[in-house]
């Protein structure tokens, strides 16, 4: 059967193609303690392709073993390794519940409990972090008539006293999640580095994300700016009520990855946002989806020659053979609040910056043709060229750069790497340390933060070489010669 979502033949390291980005996403968190190489390799070697139950059980077993290690390490007073174990357990529990959208309704409660275990493990890790981590609740009142208010759960990462920037208040970065990320996972994309650089980091589960979707049942909103408005209001209130945090409400920036990049850009139109980093964002969700679907099938549906039932039937039948297709439509349906696969595809049309394609455009945005014309703050936009058939920078990244008409060229920056090690995978999976370097370098520049070069100074004689010589001059030569001789003798 024709695959609904196509992939290029290259850059696949696992037998089942869909696992490539998902597992790269996991191993990519290793530099910040979210994964262990040996644990990862052992699991992947035994993982059956195209099997959601196998995925769930393997990751659950690994998560429980890792959590137990964390408890043992914590009891022994070994805080650093315990923190790492808790972070890994949190990430493995996230993976264990990842397939929840395609599980029967009777098992949804079971998978929600696993999600809470992921949160609890993260909380245990947070208690052992160098910086302060605070659980927060962000009030959000949807603008629709009689829509119930909801509390958005969040984590606020605050730099410790010795990590704060000298001579100024603490800037804050809002980190927006993507389609299926959890805010605990966002730690590896922003909060792992931010506090150490003097930034406060706020992550949260917005509508259609994390607990806000799973427990409150609130679907995603195409007008992400109304959510960011509530988040900004919360930050201002928090800063006023907690002067000890020393937050700079005039130095708030925002970032997001993939779909989160789209939401971050919508939020960047608020004048309280002073800079935006949009990581591999989407310009028009529907157009991107159509580029990855068989045109011979979708063309008659788009022109009403074929009803929704044909699309629904094709998706359901293909989902029986392919977990990736089943997950994509199940996750998207829950996220959007769509009643059927065809409706989910139709709902994608609202996720665009083209104002002439959205229902509320004329009411809210005057004569502008593109929402991005409202963004005036400095913007760093990235693309992912590592798999041209999966994500198309020319359809999203390039279109976004063209339509940021009111951002001066000197305040726009573009980065489209190709190799995965350089950030060529979607959401920069596998290159998160490099992403954070580029992100905070841009924010430092635009927010006027000067750090100065701090070259590493080596202390003479600090390390002892072979035969007791220091690693300087003759001591270094002696150490190298001794090591070389040892290796040579061992080989022969």
Curated annotation (Swiss-Prot):
GO terms for molecular function: hydrolase activity. It is an enzyme of class 3 (hydrolase). Homodimer. Gene3D superfamilies: acylaminoacyl peptidase, alpha/beta hydrolase. InterPro entries: AB_hydrolase_1, AB_hydrolase_fold, FrsA_esterase. The gene is ucsC. Its EC number is 3.7.1.-. Alpha/beta hydrolase; part of the gene cluster that mediates the biosynthesis of UCS1025A, a member of the pyrrolizidinone family that acts as a strong telomerase inhibitor and displays potent antibacterial and antitumor properties. These compounds share a hemiaminal-containing pyrrolizidinone core fused with a gamma-lactone, giving a furopyrrolizidine that is connected to a decalin fragment. The polyketide synthase module (PKS) of the PKS-NRPS ucsA is responsible for the synthesis of the polyketide backbone via the condensation of an acetyl-CoA starter unit with 6 malonyl-CoA units. The active site is at 258 (nucleophile). It comes from Acremonium sp. This is Alpha/beta hydrolase ucsC. Keywords: Hydrolase. The lineage of its organism: Eukaryota, Fungi, Dikarya, Ascomycota, Pezizomycotina. Pathway: Mycotoxin biosynthesis. Belongs to the AB hydrolase superfamily. FUS2 hydrolase family. Signal peptide: none annotated.
